[in-house]
Amino acid sequence: MEIIERAPAKINLGLDVLHKRVDGYHEVESIFASVDLADHLTFENLEEDIIRIETDSSFLPVDRRNHVYQAVDLLKRTYNIHKGIKIYIEKRIPVAAGLAGGSSDCAAALRGLNKLWNLGLTMDELCEIGSQIGMDVPYCLRGGTAFANGRGEKIEALPTMPQCWIVLVKPRISVSTSTVFNDLAVDELHHPDIAGLRIAIENGDYTGMTQTVGNALESVTIARHPIVQQIKDRMLKYGADAALMSGSGPTVFALCEKKTRAQRIYNGLKGFCEEVYLVRTLK
């Protein structure tokens, strides 16, 4: 038996950092949305009790560093499963891009194995397992548009964000999330209006949404990587309704109500960066 699971990318429409917690993590508020750029995972049972991860990406590890491997291993140990599995990851989401590609692959692995092995786990149980691997995994299991707080692990579903076209651009740099958080001074950050953004989304107000998107981490990443600001400026020059860095970066996205504008931005950035994608939101 072979099954296939999609693993959609996600963007941060809003991200605020409130303070550093006593446990060393930062208290955050964020609004996520799934987009139709996705990896695909194919699952196949093996007779030998091994975990085999394969992929078409040369940038992706296939050992214990891979979130998919970790998901399989955790399920096998937690539920005393003695079965072998081969998972092939068809990679379409850029690696280390701030689009939760690894977390979404992990979520797809948990969903797929729950079906393939007839585990009968509820969504809450899958989220509990996923949270042990990464804080974005519970969101990626549910997908859609959602509000997150705490360390990012507390998820509340929202209505699907107003439909629009999205241009994703990943520059040829890597950004360390831990470095960004270590560099930030919470008192000096620009704090976006997450409450206003949430209201706009709940009301289906596209204009209100574009006016309230914001990312408190942008200034920190831009200080180290000015190309992020250059991409934003180009997007706005070509007619984006809004442009924002996703997560800790380096990917930047543009929101466009009209496909013609999105296509213009796509064409204008294609020569500036290699990895440019024209996508839509997912429900």
Curated annotation (Swiss-Prot):
Record function comment: Catalyzes the phosphorylation of the position 2 hydroxy group of 4-diphosphocytidyl-2C-methyl-D-erythritol.
Gene3D superfamilies registered for this protein in UniProt: 3.30.230.10, GHMP kinase, C-terminal domain
InterPro entries to which the protein is assigned, alphabetical: GHMP_kinase_C_dom (IPR013750), GHMP_kinase_C_sf (IPR036554), GHMP_kinase_N_dom (IPR006204), IspE (IPR004424), Ribosomal_Su5_D2-typ_SF (IPR020568), Ribsml_uS5_D2-typ_fold_subgr (IPR014721)
Keywords: ATP-binding, Isoprene biosynthesis, Kinase, Nucleotide-binding, Transferase
Gene behind the chain: ispE
Organism whose genome encodes this protein: Enterococcus faecalis (strain ATCC 700802 / V583)
Full protein name: 4-diphosphocytidyl-2-C-methyl-D-erythritol kinase
SUPFAM superfamilies per UniProt: GHMP Kinase, C-terminal domain (SSF55060), Ribosomal protein S5 domain 2-like (SSF54211)
EC number, as in UniProt: 2.7.1.148
Primary enzyme class: transferase
Coiled-coil positions: none
Residues holding ATP: P94, V95, A96, A97, G98, L99, A100, G101, G102, S103, S104
Keyword ATP-binding: yes
